[in-house]
Amino acid sequence: MCPTVSLERFPRGIAVLSTPEGEELGRKLGKTFSNSYYVGTYTRELLSKAAECYDAVVLVMSLPGAFRVACEVLRGKGEGPAVVVVDPLGKFVIPLANAHWGANELAEELAGKIGATAVITTVAERRGLKPLEALARELYAELEPKELIASYYRAMLNGETICTDFDPPEGFSYLRRGEDCELRITTKCHQGTLCLKLYSLFVGIGAKPKVEDLAKRAIKALEELRVPKGRVKVVGSVREEARGVAEALGAEFRLFSFDELRDFKDDCLSPPSDTLKSMGLTGVAEIIALKLAGVKGKLLVRKVKGEDFTLAVAGVAQ
């Protein structure tokens, strides 16, 4: 199971909304990726829910209309989802909000899928610099405080190096481990410094009965999702076979019954399959991950489907 680029960039999924005029294209876009969903024609309530539950929102409508409705749910820079606009004729794909938080990448990927033109205007991408926000995504973390991000971008664009107290992932040419830079990103939060707040991770696994090599295949899926194994605290499942995943990660294991999952409510759960509905369930992997994470938990990876198992990841900021 190899995740698509969209799954790596938007693990909480992509919601597609449209005007009635754009519904046909909206439904098509909702099937473009394994983690994209057409959630319906626009209403304020539906957009608010999508903005809360998904990493990205695609609006199939005119740009002025999208700007007007997006203002209802957008907060500050870097808060809320990446928002992309696709005109109803499918000619242009335009990042509207949170360009560095994935809107630029999604616009380019969508444009490639439907033969449209992506309109990218931000400087960092034009210079080929990987955005800072991608660092947080790749490391399963949050950047705080967000009001400092703009000053870090100015330094990047001026050719300055930013120091870190961790080894940066590949692709961030402007970052290096060290202490002799004017600007730093650290995992230990200090006033006036951009902080990378790491998530403690909780993995939920759903599976058919007696799945062969479940532990091996689930571990491979976590590796493809670049989940930091050392930060997985608990693995949970309805199948005893998943205990091997926890053992391989050095994490705790909790076995759930289906009855423990039936009363769980969360607006951000993925639409259940017909099989789950017939069992009186709204989900398995996502519910387990969220129950393990507790009241402060956040769904970080919407359920990923293997051949005969599903996997989801929730997190709590450390």
Predicted segments — roles?
Residues G230-Q318:
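Active-site microenvironment for binding and transforming phosphate-containing groups
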Residues C2-R9, V16-V245, D308-Q318:
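Conserved mixed alpha/beta catalytic, RNA-binding, or beta-rich assembly cores of soluble enzyme
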